C-alpha cells in the first residue's frame, strides 16, 4: 500500500436541524469541527412522510421554483 494517500480521519460533531449533536468520525473538516445540517432524517419529507417546508438557505429553493414555475402545468 502507498503511504500518505488516505485523507485524515478524525472526530467531528454533527449538529442536526433540531439542535441535537452527536460525534462521529469523518474526513470532512478538521478535528473538532462542527457540521451543521440544513436537512436531516428528522426534517426531510422522504423520512417524515409529510410535506414539511424545506429551509431555503441561500435562496436555492426559491430560485429553482422561479426557474421551473409552471413547467408541469397542463394548459
Curated annotation (Swiss-Prot):
<keyword id="KW-0687">Ribonucleoprotein</keyword>
<keyword id="KW-0689">Ribosomal protein</keyword>
<dbReference type="InterPro" id="IPR042105">
    <property type="entry name" value="Ribosomal_bL31_sf"/>
</dbReference>
<dbReference type="Pfam" id="PF01197">
    <property type="entry name" value="Ribosomal_L31"/>
</dbReference>
<comment type="subunit">
    <text>Part of the 50S ribosomal subunit.</text>
</comment>
<dbReference type="GO" id="GO:0006412">
    <property type="term" value="P:translation"/>
</dbReference>
<dbReference type="GO" id="GO:0003735">
    <property type="term" value="F:structural constituent of ribosome"/>
</dbReference>
<keyword id="KW-0694">RNA-binding</keyword>
<dbReference type="InterPro" id="IPR002150">
    <property type="entry name" value="Ribosomal_bL31"/>
</dbReference>
<dbReference type="InterPro" id="IPR027491">
    <property type="entry name" value="Ribosomal_bL31_A"/>
</dbReference>
<comment type="similarity">
    <text>Belongs to the bacterial ribosomal protein bL31 family. Type A subfamily.</text>
</comment>
<dbReference type="InterPro" id="IPR034704">
    <property type="entry name" value="Ribosomal_bL28/bL31-like_sf"/>
</dbReference>
<comment type="function">
    <text>Binds the 23S rRNA.</text>
</comment>
<protein>
    <recommendedName>
        <fullName>Large ribosomal subunit protein bL31</fullName>
    </recommendedName>
</protein>
<dbReference type="GO" id="GO:0005840">
    <property type="term" value="C:ribosome"/>
</dbReference>
<dbReference type="GO" id="GO:0019843">
    <property type="term" value="F:rRNA binding"/>
</dbReference>
<keyword id="KW-0699">rRNA-binding</keyword>
<dbReference type="GO" id="GO:1990904">
    <property type="term" value="C:ribonucleoprotein complex"/>
</dbReference>
Amino acid at each position: 500500500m502507498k503511504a500518505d494517500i488516505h485523507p485524515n480521519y478524525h472526530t467531528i460533531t454533527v449538529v442536526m436541524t433540531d439542535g441535537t449533536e452527536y460525534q462521529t468520525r469523518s474526513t470532512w473538516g478538521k478535528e473538532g469541527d462542527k457540521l451543521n445540517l440544513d436537512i436531516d432524517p428528522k426534517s426531510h419529507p422522504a423520512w417524515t412522510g409529510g410535506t414539511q417546508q424545506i429551509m431555503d438557505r441561500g435562496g436555492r429553493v426559491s430560485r429553482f421554483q422561479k426557474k421551473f414555475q409552471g413547467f408541469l402545468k397542463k394548459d
